[in-house]
Protein backbone atom coordinates (compact mmCIF):
# COMPACT_ATOMS: atom_id res chain seq x y z
CA UNK A 1 0.00 0.00 0.00
CA UNK A 2 1.52 3.38 -1.01
CA UNK A 3 2.16 5.84 1.83
CA UNK A 4 0.99 9.42 1.28
CA UNK A 5 2.78 12.69 1.91
CA UNK A 6 0.76 13.56 5.02
CA UNK A 7 1.83 10.32 6.70
CA UNK A 8 5.47 10.92 5.77
CA UNK A 9 5.31 14.49 7.11
CA UNK A 10 3.86 13.27 10.41
CA UNK A 11 6.58 10.64 10.77
CA UNK A 12 9.36 13.09 9.90
CA UNK A 13 8.08 15.65 12.42
CA UNK A 14 7.91 13.04 15.18
CA UNK A 15 11.56 12.06 14.69
CA UNK A 16 13.06 15.52 15.17
CA UNK A 17 13.72 15.42 18.96
CA UNK A 18 15.48 12.05 18.98
CA UNK A 19 19.03 10.88 18.41
CA UNK A 20 19.59 9.00 15.13
CA UNK A 21 19.38 5.41 16.41
CA UNK A 22 16.10 6.00 18.25
CA UNK A 23 14.78 8.09 15.36
CA UNK A 24 15.51 5.23 12.95
CA UNK A 25 13.53 2.82 15.14
CA UNK A 26 10.66 5.32 15.35
CA UNK A 27 10.73 5.77 11.57
CA UNK A 28 10.40 2.01 11.17
CA UNK A 29 7.41 1.95 13.55
CA UNK A 30 5.76 4.88 11.79
CA UNK A 31 6.19 3.36 8.34
CA UNK A 32 4.81 0.01 9.51
CA UNK A 33 1.80 1.70 11.12
CA UNK A 34 1.15 3.61 7.89
CA UNK A 35 1.45 0.56 5.61
CA UNK A 36 -2.26 -0.31 5.63
CA UNK A 37 -2.44 -3.06 8.24
CA UNK A 38 -4.12 -2.93 11.63
CA UNK A 39 -2.50 -2.98 15.06
CA UNK A 40 -3.86 -6.46 15.76
CA UNK A 41 -2.25 -7.83 12.63
CA UNK A 42 1.14 -6.39 13.57
CA UNK A 43 0.97 -7.07 17.33
CA UNK A 44 3.28 -10.10 17.27
CA UNK A 45 6.00 -8.18 15.42
CA UNK A 46 5.86 -5.08 17.62
CA UNK A 47 8.00 -6.19 20.60
CA UNK A 48 11.07 -6.81 18.45
CA UNK A 49 10.60 -3.47 16.68
CA UNK A 50 9.76 -1.34 19.73
CA UNK A 51 12.69 -2.63 21.78
CA UNK A 52 15.01 -0.99 19.25
CA UNK A 53 13.59 2.34 20.45
CA UNK A 54 12.98 1.55 24.13
CA UNK A 55 14.56 -1.54 25.74
CA UNK A 56 11.75 -3.70 27.15
CA UNK A 57 11.23 -7.23 28.40
CA UNK A 58 7.56 -7.51 27.45
CA UNK A 59 4.86 -5.57 25.61
CA UNK A 60 1.10 -5.27 25.90
CA UNK A 61 -1.19 -3.68 23.32
CA UNK A 62 -4.64 -2.45 24.31
CA UNK A 63 -7.63 -0.97 22.51
CA UNK A 64 -10.15 1.43 24.01
CA UNK A 65 -13.59 2.92 23.53
CA UNK A 66 -14.05 6.64 22.85
CA UNK A 67 -14.67 7.03 26.58
CA UNK A 68 -11.24 5.62 27.35
CA UNK A 69 -12.24 2.21 28.68
CA UNK A 70 -10.31 -0.90 27.64
CA UNK A 71 -12.21 -3.04 25.13
CA UNK A 72 -9.54 -5.49 24.00
CA UNK A 73 -5.93 -6.34 24.67
CA UNK A 74 -2.96 -8.51 23.76
CA UNK A 75 0.21 -9.25 25.68
CA UNK A 76 3.43 -11.12 25.01
CA UNK A 77 2.78 -12.79 28.36
CA UNK A 78 -0.70 -14.35 27.99
CA UNK A 79 -1.20 -14.67 31.75
CA UNK A 80 -1.29 -10.86 32.03
CA UNK A 81 -4.68 -10.97 30.28
CA UNK A 82 -5.99 -14.20 31.73
CA UNK A 83 -9.49 -14.31 33.15
CA UNK A 84 -8.07 -14.56 36.67
CA UNK A 85 -5.83 -11.51 36.17
CA UNK A 86 -8.67 -9.41 34.76
CA UNK A 87 -10.87 -10.30 37.72
CA UNK A 88 -8.03 -9.45 40.09
CA UNK A 89 -7.52 -6.13 38.30
CA UNK A 90 -11.20 -5.26 38.73
CA UNK A 91 -11.01 -6.10 42.42
CA UNK A 92 -7.88 -3.97 42.82
CA UNK A 93 -9.49 -0.98 41.08
CA UNK A 94 -12.50 -1.26 43.37
CA UNK A 95 -10.26 -0.99 46.44
CA UNK A 96 -7.73 1.56 45.15
CA UNK A 97 -9.27 4.16 42.89
CA UNK A 98 -5.99 5.18 41.28
CA UNK A 99 -4.27 1.83 41.42
CA UNK A 100 -4.95 0.90 37.81
CA UNK A 101 -5.71 3.91 35.60
CA UNK A 102 -8.14 3.79 32.71
CA UNK A 103 -7.23 5.24 29.34
CA UNK A 104 -9.34 8.27 30.23
CA UNK A 105 -7.24 9.04 33.28
CA UNK A 106 -4.05 8.72 31.29
CA UNK A 107 -5.31 11.05 28.58
CA UNK A 108 -5.65 13.78 31.20
CA UNK A 109 -1.85 13.73 31.35
CA UNK A 110 -1.72 14.70 27.67
CA UNK A 111 -2.46 13.16 24.27
CA UNK A 112 0.87 11.38 24.08
CA UNK A 113 1.48 9.17 27.09
CA UNK A 114 0.32 8.55 30.62
CA UNK A 115 2.64 7.06 33.19
CA UNK A 116 1.91 4.26 35.58
CA UNK A 117 5.12 4.56 37.67
CA UNK A 118 3.84 7.33 40.01
CA UNK A 119 1.00 5.02 40.99
CA UNK A 120 3.24 1.99 41.47
CA UNK A 121 3.57 2.54 45.19
CA UNK A 122 4.27 -0.06 47.85
CA UNK A 123 0.59 -0.95 48.08
CA UNK A 124 0.63 -1.81 44.37
CA UNK A 125 3.68 -4.06 44.69
CA UNK A 126 2.24 -5.72 47.80
CA UNK A 127 -1.15 -6.40 46.22
CA UNK A 128 -2.43 -9.81 45.17
CA UNK A 129 -3.08 -8.28 41.75
CA UNK A 130 0.61 -7.43 41.20
CA UNK A 131 1.78 -10.79 42.55
CA UNK A 132 -0.50 -12.70 40.17
CA UNK A 133 0.14 -10.57 37.09
CA UNK A 134 3.24 -8.42 36.57
CA UNK A 135 5.06 -9.91 39.54
CA UNK A 136 4.54 -13.45 38.27
CA UNK A 137 6.30 -12.45 35.06
CA UNK A 138 9.05 -10.58 36.89
CA UNK A 139 7.94 -7.20 35.51
CA UNK A 140 8.79 -4.35 37.88
CA UNK A 141 8.73 -1.18 35.77
CA UNK A 142 5.67 -0.35 33.68
CA UNK A 143 5.13 2.50 31.22
CA UNK A 144 1.76 3.26 29.62
CA UNK A 145 1.93 5.04 26.23
CA UNK A 146 -1.52 6.19 25.16
CA UNK A 147 -2.54 6.35 21.50
CA UNK A 148 -4.66 9.49 21.10
CA UNK A 149 -5.49 11.34 17.87
CA UNK A 150 -6.43 14.63 19.54
CA UNK A 151 -10.11 13.75 19.62
CA UNK A 152 -10.26 10.45 21.47
CA UNK A 153 -8.05 7.65 22.79
CA UNK A 154 -7.71 4.52 20.66
CA UNK A 155 -5.64 2.39 23.00
CA UNK A 156 -2.18 2.18 24.46
CA UNK A 157 1.06 0.26 24.65
CA UNK A 158 2.14 -1.16 27.98
CA UNK A 159 5.95 -1.28 28.03
CA UNK A 160 7.31 -3.53 30.76
CA UNK A 161 10.71 -4.52 32.02
CA UNK A 162 12.33 -6.30 34.92
CA UNK A 163 14.11 -4.62 37.80
CA UNK A 164 17.59 -5.21 36.30
CA UNK A 165 17.00 -2.61 33.58
CA UNK A 166 15.79 0.03 36.01
CA UNK A 167 12.85 2.43 35.70
CA UNK A 168 12.09 4.26 32.47
CA UNK A 169 13.90 7.59 32.21
CA UNK A 170 12.59 10.86 30.76
CA UNK A 171 13.99 10.17 27.27
CA UNK A 172 12.40 6.73 27.17
CA UNK A 173 9.08 8.16 28.30
CA UNK A 174 9.24 10.71 25.47
CA UNK A 175 10.10 7.91 23.03
CA UNK A 176 7.12 5.86 24.23
CA UNK A 177 4.88 8.89 23.69
CA UNK A 178 6.19 9.18 20.11
CA UNK A 179 5.51 5.48 19.52
CA UNK A 180 1.91 6.07 20.57
CA UNK A 181 1.50 8.99 18.19
CA UNK A 182 3.15 7.21 15.27
CA UNK A 183 0.84 4.23 15.74
CA UNK A 184 -2.41 6.14 15.20
CA UNK A 185 -2.88 5.03 11.53
CA UNK A 186 -2.69 1.34 12.50
CA UNK A 187 -5.22 1.78 15.33
CA UNK A 188 -7.58 3.50 12.87
CA UNK A 189 -7.17 0.71 10.30
CA UNK A 190 -9.95 -1.88 10.21
CA UNK A 191 -9.06 -5.54 10.80
CA UNK A 192 -9.76 -6.47 7.18
CA UNK A 193 -8.14 -9.62 5.73
CA UNK A 194 -4.67 -8.92 4.33
CA UNK A 195 -2.35 -11.14 2.31
CA UNK A 196 -0.17 -12.91 4.86
CA UNK A 197 2.73 -14.91 3.51
CA UNK A 198 5.51 -14.73 6.10
CA UNK A 199 5.75 -17.25 8.92
CA UNK A 200 6.28 -15.73 12.33
CA UNK A 201 6.59 -16.83 15.94
CA UNK A 202 6.83 -20.60 15.55
CA UNK A 203 4.89 -22.25 18.34
CA UNK A 204 5.84 -25.81 19.32
CA UNK A 205 3.95 -28.33 21.46
CA UNK A 206 4.82 -31.97 22.04
CA UNK A 207 2.71 -34.60 23.75
CA UNK A 208 3.45 -37.99 25.22
CA UNK A 209 1.82 -41.26 24.23
CA UNK A 210 -0.89 -40.63 26.82
CA UNK A 211 -1.75 -37.23 25.33
CA UNK A 212 -0.18 -35.23 28.15
CA UNK A 213 1.75 -32.09 27.24
CA UNK A 214 5.49 -32.74 27.51
CA UNK A 215 6.74 -29.42 26.11
CA UNK A 216 5.31 -26.14 24.88
CA UNK A 217 6.84 -22.75 24.21
CA UNK A 218 5.52 -19.24 24.78
CA UNK A 219 4.83 -18.67 21.07
CA UNK A 220 2.39 -21.60 21.07
CA UNK A 221 0.55 -20.15 24.05
CA UNK A 222 0.41 -16.73 22.37
CA UNK A 223 -1.07 -18.18 19.18
CA UNK A 224 -3.71 -20.25 20.96
CA UNK A 225 -4.59 -17.22 23.07
CA UNK A 226 -5.17 -15.19 19.88
CA UNK A 227 -7.34 -17.93 18.40
CA UNK A 228 -9.49 -17.85 21.54
CA UNK A 229 -9.91 -14.04 21.63
CA UNK A 230 -11.86 -13.50 18.44
CA UNK A 231 -15.37 -12.68 19.57
CA UNK A 232 -17.39 -9.51 19.98
CA UNK A 233 -16.64 -9.00 23.67
CA UNK A 234 -13.08 -10.35 24.02
CA UNK A 235 -12.60 -9.26 27.62
CA UNK A 236 -15.88 -10.55 29.03
CA UNK A 237 -16.93 -14.08 29.98
CA UNK A 238 -13.51 -15.50 29.13
CA UNK A 239 -13.82 -18.55 31.33
CA UNK A 240 -10.95 -21.00 31.68
CA UNK A 241 -8.14 -19.85 29.39
CA UNK A 242 -5.27 -21.88 30.81
CA UNK A 243 -2.88 -23.38 28.28
CA UNK A 244 -4.32 -26.84 28.89
CA UNK A 245 -7.82 -25.56 28.17
CA UNK A 246 -6.71 -23.76 25.01
CA UNK A 247 -4.90 -26.86 23.78
CA UNK A 248 -8.00 -28.96 24.37
CA UNK A 249 -10.18 -26.51 22.44
CA UNK A 250 -7.94 -25.96 19.44
CA UNK A 251 -5.48 -28.84 19.14
CA UNK A 252 -6.79 -32.02 20.76
CA UNK A 253 -8.92 -33.04 17.77
CA UNK A 254 -6.13 -32.36 15.27
CA UNK A 255 -3.66 -34.31 17.40
CA UNK A 256 -6.04 -37.27 17.45
CA UNK A 257 -6.24 -37.20 13.65
CA UNK A 258 -2.45 -37.11 13.38
CA UNK A 259 -2.18 -40.21 15.56
CA UNK A 260 -4.41 -42.02 13.06
CA UNK A 261 -2.97 -40.71 9.79
CA UNK A 262 0.56 -39.64 10.72
CA UNK A 263 0.04 -35.99 9.77
CA UNK A 264 -2.67 -33.37 9.85
CA UNK A 265 -2.86 -29.69 8.89
CA UNK A 266 -5.32 -26.92 9.79
CA UNK A 267 -5.63 -23.26 8.86
CA UNK A 268 -7.43 -20.63 10.93
CA UNK A 269 -8.11 -17.01 10.05
CA UNK A 270 -9.40 -14.30 12.34
CA UNK A 271 -8.90 -10.60 13.00
CA UNK A 272 -5.44 -11.26 14.45
CA UNK A 273 -4.24 -12.86 11.23
CA UNK A 274 -3.78 -16.28 9.66
CA UNK A 275 -2.60 -19.33 11.62
CA UNK A 276 -1.29 -22.64 10.29
CA UNK A 277 -1.26 -25.64 12.65
CA UNK A 278 0.66 -28.77 11.63
CA UNK A 279 0.47 -32.07 13.52
CA UNK A 280 2.87 -34.98 13.12
CA UNK A 281 2.99 -38.30 14.95
CA UNK A 282 6.30 -38.58 16.82
CA UNK A 283 8.54 -41.63 17.19
CA UNK A 284 7.41 -42.16 20.79
CA UNK A 285 3.71 -42.34 19.80
CA UNK A 286 3.07 -38.77 20.83
CA UNK A 287 2.35 -35.76 18.61
CA UNK A 288 4.46 -32.75 17.61
CA UNK A 289 2.34 -29.65 17.00
CA UNK A 290 3.71 -26.54 15.30
CA UNK A 291 1.74 -23.30 15.12
CA UNK A 292 2.80 -20.52 12.76
CA UNK A 293 1.12 -17.16 12.48
CA UNK A 294 1.29 -15.83 8.94
CA UNK A 295 1.94 -12.09 8.94
CA UNK A 296 1.74 -9.51 6.13
CA UNK A 297 5.00 -8.68 4.35
CA UNK A 298 5.04 -5.24 6.01
CA UNK A 299 5.55 -6.88 9.42
CA UNK A 300 8.33 -9.06 8.04
CA UNK A 301 9.97 -6.01 6.47
CA UNK A 302 9.81 -4.05 9.72
CA UNK A 303 11.42 -6.87 11.71
CA UNK A 304 14.18 -7.18 9.10
CA UNK A 305 14.87 -3.44 9.17
CA UNK A 306 14.95 -3.40 12.98
CA UNK A 307 18.55 -3.76 14.07
CA UNK A 308 20.10 -3.01 10.66
CA UNK A 309 21.51 0.28 11.99
CA UNK A 310 20.19 2.35 9.08
CA UNK A 311 19.77 6.11 9.31
CA UNK A 312 16.19 7.40 9.79
CA UNK A 313 16.11 8.71 6.21
CA UNK A 314 17.44 5.45 4.79
CA UNK A 315 14.79 3.51 6.71
CA UNK A 316 12.09 5.59 5.03
CA UNK A 317 13.67 5.31 1.58
CA UNK A 318 13.88 1.54 2.02
CA UNK A 319 10.22 1.28 2.98
CA UNK A 320 9.01 3.48 0.12
CA UNK A 321 11.14 1.65 -2.43
CA UNK A 322 9.96 -1.80 -1.33
CA UNK A 323 6.34 -0.62 -1.28
CA UNK A 324 6.62 0.31 -4.96
CA UNK A 325 7.26 4.05 -5.00
CA UNK A 326 9.42 5.44 -7.80
CA UNK A 327 12.61 7.38 -7.09
CA UNK A 328 10.95 10.60 -8.17
CA UNK A 329 7.98 9.87 -5.93
CA UNK A 330 10.26 9.10 -2.97
CA UNK A 331 12.10 12.40 -3.48
CA UNK A 332 8.77 14.23 -3.55
CA UNK A 333 7.45 12.50 -0.42
CA UNK A 334 10.65 13.07 1.57
CA UNK A 335 11.19 16.57 0.16
CA UNK A 336 14.74 15.82 -0.92
CA UNK A 337 16.50 15.75 -4.27
CA UNK A 338 16.46 12.71 -6.54
CA UNK A 339 20.26 12.56 -6.23
CA UNK A 340 19.91 12.11 -2.47
CA UNK A 341 17.40 9.32 -2.99
CA UNK A 342 19.74 7.67 -5.50
CA UNK A 343 22.57 7.72 -2.93
CA UNK A 344 20.41 5.98 -0.34
CA UNK A 345 19.19 3.39 -2.85
CA UNK A 346 22.72 2.68 -4.10
CA UNK A 347 23.86 2.09 -0.51
CA UNK A 348 20.93 -0.27 0.11
CA UNK A 349 21.62 -2.19 -3.10
CA UNK A 350 25.31 -2.53 -2.23
CA UNK A 351 24.55 -3.77 1.27
CA UNK A 352 22.08 -6.43 0.17
CA UNK A 353 23.61 -7.38 -3.16
CA UNK A 354 20.62 -6.04 -5.08
CA UNK A 355 20.43 -4.39 -8.47
CA UNK A 356 16.74 -3.52 -8.55
CA UNK A 357 13.86 -2.90 -6.16
CA UNK A 358 12.63 -6.42 -6.93
CA UNK A 359 16.01 -7.81 -5.86
CA UNK A 360 15.73 -5.84 -2.63
CA UNK A 361 12.29 -7.30 -1.94
CA UNK A 362 13.73 -10.78 -2.51
CA UNK A 363 16.60 -10.02 -0.14
CA UNK A 364 14.17 -8.99 2.59
CA UNK A 365 11.97 -12.01 1.87
CA UNK A 366 14.63 -14.53 2.85
Task: For each feature predicted by the language model, list its residue ranges.
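PAS-family sensory domains
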Residues: 200-266
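PAS-family sensory/regulatory modules and their coupling/dimerization elements
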Residues: 245-296
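Regulatory input/activation interfaces that engage signals or partners
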Residues: 2-171, 175, 181, 185, ...
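Recognition helix of helix-turn-helix DNA-binding domains
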Residues: 324-359
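Sensory-domain cores of signal-transduction modules, predominantly PAS/LOV
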Residues: 60, 202-205, 328
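The N-cap/first-turn positions of alpha helices
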Residues: 313-317
